[in-house]
């Protein structure tokens, strides 16, 4: 379910799991990446051509990080598809 706040700020939400919002900013361009926020923390993962790798992390517990990484890994195709649709790639 899309988060109205994210949409109002032009930040398309891809999905929400475990209390975390997975989204990207419309004005940010390459490299392909996804932001994650929730439970008082944030992270950013960039696509390296093979997988999403962590590039920023703040305030996310290890257990939550593992869940987030699993969600991203299992949904990489969806993330890439949504990115390409949004940026007309």
Where are these regions (language model features)?
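Generic preference for hydrophobic/aromatic residues in regular secondary structure cores
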Residues: 14, 52-56, 75
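A short, structured beta-strand/loop element
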Residues: 25-62
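Short leucine-rich amphipathic alpha-helices used at interfaces
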Residues: 14, 42-43, 86
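N-terminal first-folded block
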Residues: 2-35, 39
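Generic detection of intrinsically disordered/low-complexity segments and helix-coil linkers/edges
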Residues: 16-19, 39-41, 59, 77, ...
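C-terminal structural segments of small proteins and small subunits
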Residues: 61-89
